[in-house]
């Protein structure tokens, strides 16, 4: 969140002196402004409430009260006050902007987006409105729209390192999604091998990169840059003509989109590293890179540097906790997720990770409460249902286990382990037909996994969400 005083200076108007000669009113107005300047929003709220009761039809005064409530973390009350301000003057910027921010703080991006879009329409050059509209789009998984907003912010405010980082993250996610689409459209095609080779080359693994480029070149000898990539790494390129059947236009399109997104992401991150090499965002970029390279110890160290520079940055304790879980250090991870929960109490993903960690530590009742809370929040991860399914299976509550696992598998159809757990639930229910179906799905998906190519496995690892082994906690001291 940006510093309160920066926002106040840009958005608050206090027209009271022109509207009344009352010395008492002026005194309360001055007290409100003084409280804002020193960050005492509790007092500012009290002063603005006094003024608003005496000038209930003043839209700007209602807006000022709403902003004070917002910075006092009274988001629901702020929204109600902003609504009143907008009924008096629908074209005020601050009520739309801060209503959107309040909904975002309440983890309600669907409600935040329309307000922030209106704020941008009212003032297209407002950096704050565009930045948070971008974040709200990210929360909705609308990454292309988010990238457009962050790109505009970097144009309006070239020194805004947060916007450059967010832009890189948006393009990274766009590239990830295009890569997954490529793997679905042509899992063993030349472009998948090419993309895997490029990723390995970026990591500095020339030998594996060459092997992947040779596989790609063998499948698509018609692509000049593939021949060049093979030869540049010391290999011998294939120059035989490719058959028309080997050319997949969709494959080429998806590769081009994934490649372009990756380049744009890298350019944004490189800008951060060049413009602000000692910033918390630069250290975050390095930490994220260590995660992709499966170097969790280095990632944790880099993330801790981020926290030294900006202790209240959301997502960092979560990232450390996830890395600790992957290392089998569940007790330490619990501390990190609890710290993250203080920063993001309404985050479904944080609550789900906390619930998973509690399960690993054998704190089943706490885990259940946390996971059920996650399911009541905005866009809960499907994993919450999987974890509840495992918990209910452990309790021999087979019906509840089957219900939760089926909800999980409705979206995560290729999780072989979940199908196996579901078969156990149906066995407990003496439902042989459903048990056999679940086992057949388990066997099929397991065989499909064995048949996956090296390129598929490499790209899936690089482009997947960070995965935590549920059994990791059992190995912790």
Q: What spans do the regions from the language model cover?
A:
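Helix-start (N-cap) detector for alpha-helical repeat units in TPR-like alpha-solenoids
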Residues: 25, 59-60, 93-94, 127-128, ...
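Register position in tetratricopeptide repeats
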Residues: 37-38, 71-72, 105-106, 139, ...
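Canonical positions in the second alpha-helix
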Residues: 50-51, 84-85, 118-119, 152-153, ...
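Structural marker of alpha-solenoid helical repeat scaffolds
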Residues: 54, 88, 122, 156, ...
């Amino acid at each position: 969140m940006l510093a309160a005083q920066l926002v106040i200076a840009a958005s608050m108007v206090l027209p009271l002196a022109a509207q009344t000669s009352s010395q008492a009113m002026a005194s309360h107005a001055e007290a409100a402004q003084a409280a804002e300047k020193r960050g005492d929003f509790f007092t500012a709220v009290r002063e603005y409430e006094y003024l608003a009761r005496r000038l209930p039809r003043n839209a700007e005064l209602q807006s000022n009260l709403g902003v004070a409530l917002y910075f006092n973390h009274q988001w629901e009350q702020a929204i109600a006050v902003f609504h009143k301000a907008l009924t008096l003057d629908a074209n005020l910027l601050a009520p739309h902007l801060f209503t959107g921010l309040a909904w975002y703080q309440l983890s309600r991006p669907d409600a935040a987006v329309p307000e922030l879009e209106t704020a941008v329409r009212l003032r297209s050059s407002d950096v704050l409105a565009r930045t948070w509209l971008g974040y709200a789009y990210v929360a909705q998984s609308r990454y292309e729209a988010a990238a457009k907003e962050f790109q505009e912010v970097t144009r309006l405010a070239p020194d805004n390192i947060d916007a450059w980082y967010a832009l890189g993250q948006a393009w990274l996610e766009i590239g990830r999604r295009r890569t997954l689409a490529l793997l679905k459209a042509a899992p063993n095609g030349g472009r998948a091998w090419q993309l895997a080779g490029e990723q390995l080359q970026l990591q500095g693994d020339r030998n594996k990169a060459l092997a992947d480029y040779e596989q790609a070149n063998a499948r698509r000898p018609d692509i000049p840059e593939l021949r060049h990539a093979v030869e540049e790494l010391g290999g011998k390129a294939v120059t035989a003509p490719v058959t028309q059947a080997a050319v997949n236009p969709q494959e080429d399109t998806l590769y081009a989109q994934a490649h372009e997104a990756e380049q744009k992401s890298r350019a944004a991150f490189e800008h951060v590293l060049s413009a602000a090499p000692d910033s918390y965002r630069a250290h975050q970029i390095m930490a994220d890179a260590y995660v992709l390279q499966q170097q969790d110890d280095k990632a944790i160290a880099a993330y801790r540097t981020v926290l030294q520079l900006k202790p209240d940055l959301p997502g960092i304790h979560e990232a450390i906790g996830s890395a600790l879980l992957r290392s089998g250090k569940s007790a330490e991870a619990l501390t990190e997720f609890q710290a993250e929960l203080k920063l993001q109490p309404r985050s479904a993903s944080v609550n789900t990770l906390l619930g998973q960690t509690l399960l690993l530590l054998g704190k089943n009742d706490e885990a259940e409460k946390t996971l059920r809370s996650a399911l009541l929040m905005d866009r809960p991860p499907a994993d919450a249902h999987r974890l509840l399914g495992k918990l209910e299976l452990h309790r021999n509550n087979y019906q509840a286990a089957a219900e939760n696992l089926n909800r999980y598998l409705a979206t995560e159809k290729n999780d072989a382990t979940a199908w196996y757990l579901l078969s156990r639930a149906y066995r407990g229910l003496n439902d042989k037909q459903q048990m056999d179906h679940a086992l057949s799905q388990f066997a099929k998906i397991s065989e499909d996994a064995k048949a996956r190519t090296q390129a598929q496995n490499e790209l899936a690892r690089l482009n997947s969400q960070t995965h935590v082994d549920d059994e990791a906690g059992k190995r912790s001291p």
